[in-house]
Amino acid sequence: MTNLRKTHPLMKIVNSSFIDLPAPSNISSWWNFGSLLGVCLIIQILTGLFLAMHYTSDTMTAFSSVTHICRDVNYGWLIRYLHANGASMFFICLFLHVGRGLYYGSYMYLETWNIGVLLLFAVMATAFMGYVLPWGQMSFWGATVITNLLSAIPYIGSDLVEWIWGGFSVDKATLTRFFAFHFILPFIIAALAGVHLLFLHETGSNNPSGLSSDADKIPFHPYYTIKDILGVLLLILVLTSLVLFSPDVLGDPDNYTPANPLNTPPHIKPEWYFLFAYAILRSIPNKLGGVLALVLSIVVLALVPFLHTSKQRSIMFRPFSQCLFWILVADLLTLTWIGGQPVEHPFIIIGQLASILYFLLILVIMPITSVSEDNLMKW
């Protein structure tokens, strides 16, 4: 008798995706982040669902409904902080996942990579709208500043901003629609993640060497299921430690003050995972230029496959490219730090130099270095 998991229409899909999937035998722990992102998404959807049962998307009651969740709902504080810090874990895994893709040349799977970039945009949009919902000072002013950027678009800019606001300022209509979008987007992300996996399984996984692994495959279960479970346990350990010991360490104290349109906070800044993009935005004095740079800082990822000039896929055997990769990582950390600093000397010039270096590295220096390395190989 044939095994049910290989014949049943639904089980067959699960089987070919998570059980009998042929996987390269040499993939390292850097390949754990895909499954960790799946776990993060499930945690966010579940905690978000329970929060939505008690939250009210009205400017008069939003802030107090979050307070009510933390004070009066059974384990409401736990659900709220799991959701808030779960977002941070989500972005840590996302950045490491993208970094892995850049390091090992996984971007050569074009469809998978492009859907990944789309997923990154969707997660960033979801996180931004989620940050607005508690209706604290930073929620309100963050929403005002970021949505106002759209007014830089010629001709339709100001109309577009008012259309998004649903009025002449960030108000009840804005909060209600942000809540609606924040609720629906994670399900769209889950669907996109399914398509992401579909395209990945068309080609099979990449591996650290960047070479074809067709000659040496092992079944996903039990080898990588066990490996993924270890990753999940470590993720949960870090998340629970964060939630139970220092739940507010990544948040902003200003968000514990109810939103007040008449009082601007001294330093408006987004959550830590947007600071690198925020620093790039601020480093350009022109409004439209800043908005374009902000969008390009993420869109540039979609250009990476077309800038691949090396004969080797991975940079595992390319020392110069490795150095440049880690300079890029250091540059992004610098941008993240600058994004959280006030707009004054010397932070302005550091931010501008780091922004220029970011685009130069990806668009110019790394492709040229790849060609140079190939030529050095001929010597």
Curated annotation (Swiss-Prot):
Residues binding heme b b562 are 83, 182
Cofactor-binding details, from the entry = Binds 2 heme b groups non-covalently.
Q: Where in the cell is it found?
A: Mitochondrion inner membrane
Name the source's superkingdom: Eukaryota
Quick one: which residues bind heme b b566? 97, 196
Any Pfam family the entry gives: Cytochrom_B_C
Topology versus the membrane: Multi-pass membrane protein
Identify one Gene Ontology CC term for this UniProt entry: respiratory chain complex III
Q: Which cofactor does it need?
A: heme b
Q: Please list every transmembrane segment annotated in the UniProt record, as residue ranges.
A: 33-53, 77-98, 113-133, 178-198, 226-246, 288-308, 320-340, 347-367
Signal sequence extent:
none
Gene3D superfamilies, sorted: Cytochrome Bc1 Complex, Chain C
Subunit relationships: The cytochrome bc1 complex contains 11 subunits: 3 respiratory subunits (MT-CYB, CYC1 and UQCRFS1), 2 core proteins (UQCRC1 and UQCRC2) and 6 low-molecular weight proteins (UQCRH/QCR6, UQCRB/QCR7, UQCRQ/QCR8, UQCR10/QCR9, UQCR11/QCR10 and a cleavage product of UQCRFS1). This cytochrome bc1 complex then forms a dimer.
Family membership noted in the UniProt record: Belongs to the cytochrome b family.
Name of the featured protein: Cytochrome b
